[in-house]
Design a protein with these regions (language model features):
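Active-site-proximal region of nucleotide-activated glycan assembly enzymes
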Residues: 49, 57, 68, 127-187
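Nucleotide-sugar donor-binding and catalytic loop/hinge architecture
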Residues: 6, 11-16, 181-198, 205, ...
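Glycosyltransferases and closely related glycan-assembly transferases
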Residues: 98-111, 119-134, 147-151
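Donor-nucleotide binding loops and adjacent catalytic segments primarily
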Residues: 56, 61, 65, 187-270, ...
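Conserved nucleotide-sugar phosphate-binding/catalytic loop shared by glycosyltransferases and other
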Residues: 18-23, 45-91, 96, 234-236, ...
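Acidic donor-binding loop of glycosyltransferase active sites
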Residues: 108-110, 265-280, 287-288
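A short, well-ordered alpha-helix in the C-terminal region of glycosyltransferases
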Residues: 341-355
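C-terminal alpha-helical cap of glycosyltransferases
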Residues: 354-373
């Protein structure tokens, strides 16, 4: 069993060194950044080390956020052929060996897994060497890495109570952490030109991009009353930018936006997928949204996320199979043409927000460390 050394604790028994492992997409990474900020808030001299892969979004964003990053080999076991699985298995074993070296060098108080296959090597090494560890699970159905390792962690911090059965008495419902900037976004005064923020997560969404492109002819009479801010993902940025230009719309189109909270703050309406982190950010920001759940998410959990928002009268949902340019345009016109309805969605979204999730998770991390002393 790992025995905590005095130098991993702050003067008030706060965590001085922590590893945050995983990423791949913003949905995994951004909650981890929120937790890192909370650790720093409690201990201003705390050292945070992120561990991920070179292929994930963390390779670009973690250094931009001012944190150290170490990359390990790892690979997904889902959605790939047997040859790729064999290669990824070898990479993951190498990653576990590398993770053990990192643990020996950094000697953290705790290892926090944020999900994704990138978390697997570091969490596995923490389990094998007895370091305190916990996992964060954002979705109603856990990812493969969390399902495989969940029985050997100290705690599983959950967003959705329905996930409880996967982790038994290690499960604690904390909510999904949101970066601090989203919580301080003020209410918006709605007046033309209305800003519509469109994105499909950190990697974009082809069906949303297509529907927005096809919606433009149906929004032609609103051309002077709309401004689009559209995060397309890497593969469609030029195509979508050209569509706006050809239709004569004012649009800022990029593959990826840094400082995304600024786009939320300026938005009158959001069109997005319904990943757990996106939904948590929409709630925290208090913004009205049209949610288009990704239809191939495990056990259709994005539909469950969106439906919970609809049940709270906090968002509009359009099923991916029913998403057309004409329907999207009609929904945009309906909401932006009724400011009272827009403001009601915003109020209800903010009411549904859990704003202290990262505090609850760091409390769990401290509890995990204390259990190993």
């Amino acid at each position: 069993m790992f025995l905590c050394n005095l130098d991993v604790w702050g003067p008030d028994l706060g965590i001085m060194r922590a590893i945050i492992a995983g990423g791949g997409t913003g949905g995994h990474l951004f909650p981890g950044i929120a937790v890192a900020r909370e650790i720093q808030r409690r201990e201003k001299n705390a050292e945070i080390l992120f561990v991920g892969t070179e292929q994930g979004i963390e390779a670009r964003l973690v250094p931009q956020e001012g944190f150290r990053l170490r990359c390990l080999p790892a690979g997904s076991m889902k959605g790939v052929g047997w040859g790729a699985r064999a290669r990824n298995l070898v990479a993951t074993v190498k990653g576990i060996l590398g993770a053990r070296r990192i643990l020996g060098e950094f000697r953290p108080a705790v290892v926090i897994g944020v999900g994704g296959y990138a978390s697997f090597p570091m969490l596995s090494a923490a389990i094998l060497t007895g370091y305190p560890r916990l996992i964060m699970e954002q979705n109603a159905v856990p990812g493969l890495a969390n399902r495989m390792l969940g029985r050997w962690v100290d705690f599983a911090a959950l967003t959705d109570p329905r996930t409880h059965s996967y982790f038994g008495d290690r499960a604690v419902v904390t909510g999904n952490p949101v970066r601090p900037q989203f919580k301080s976004i003020p209410a918006k005064t709605h007046q033309p030109p209305f800003q519509v923020l469109v994105f499909g997560g950190s990697q974009g969404a082809r069906s949303i991009n297509k529907a927005v492109r096809e919606s433009l002819p149906f929004l032609s009479e609103w051309k002077d009353r709309l401004r689009f801010v559209h995060q397309t993902g890497e593969n469609q940025v030029h195509e979508i930018r050209s569509a706006y230009e050809d239709a004569g719309f004012n649009a800022d189109v990029r593959a990826f936006f840094n400082g995304f909270h600024e786009q939320y703050a300026a938005a009158d309406l959001i069109v997005a997928r319904a990943g757990a982190t996106t939904v948590a950010e929409i709630k925290a920001a208090g913004r009205a949204a049209i949610l288009v759940p990704f239809p191939f998410a495990a056990d259709d959990h994005q539909t469950q996320n969106a439906r919970s928002m609809v049940d709270d009268d906090a968002a509009i949902m359009i099923a991916n199979a029913k998403l057309t340019g004409e329907r999207l345009a009609a929904t945009i016109r309906s909401l932006l043409g009724d400011v009272a309805r827009l403001e009601a969605l915003e109020r209800n979204a903010r009411k549904a927000a859990v704003l202290d999730a990262e505090q609850r998770i760091v409390d769990l991390a401290e509890k995990a460390v204390q259990a190993h002393v």
